[in-house]
């Protein structure tokens, strides 16, 4: 009797502890917030500055997996990974302070707008003696960044644990996915691939639930259920992988004398050694 009482007591403790997720759930309207950073964001921003920034073009850094989200309700046309990876890469290049990204993803829109400006100026200045002010030429890139999200593997590790005794019990489960990003640096002068970097990032999902189903008295049934699930945002995982790839590109570029950093040799040696440890 004492043993069963202790087990019920422990089960109730687990239930009440799990209820913390319920009582702390967001029930009010949340304000918009600026984008979350990742551990790789801090590391990327703390790199030594370059001696001269590099003009870089990114035409398309896309999802190459072709995978869709799994669904139990038939067809699902939502992709498994984000389709905005080009924007994420450009933001990472800006944050590094090593590169000057130029608009290439929607180049047709830029060229069309410049044509509109030229035609408008010619139309309104043709009857005047003033000279037509020419548009400044577009920047051209010394290097291009190519690649994309090449792999998304779901359920690479799954598992769980559960126990139940006299109607009281709890269980937990987890799942691990993985996303892989490839990034390559291409010279626009001769088309040579100067450097290729690939980074993999795991994505963790966890769930915990507990329940109690027990007759506490004649015709008196106690039934309690609680639980919560925690999923790592896939977009943040992709962001971290891309930022880590940019960081690796910069460090290996310094190591191979592709570009030069404006920092003492001791600092560069420390950065390179720390990178090689990973």
Language-model segments: residues:
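"Short basic amphipathic alpha-helical interaction patches in structured regions
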Residues: 72-74, 159-167
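C-terminal/domain-edge helix-coil "capping" segments
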Residues: 20-52, 153, 160-161, 172-278
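Bacterial N-terminal signal peptides that target proteins for export
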Residues: 1-8
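Hydrophobic helical h-region of N-terminal Sec-dependent signal peptides
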Residues: 9-13
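C-terminal motif of bacterial Sec signal peptides marking the signal peptidase cleavage site
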Residues: 15-18
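N-terminal segment of the mature soluble domain
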Residues: 54-55, 59-155, 178, 184-195
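Short alpha-helical segments and helix-capping/turn motifs at coil-helix boundaries
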Residues: 1, 39-43, 129-131
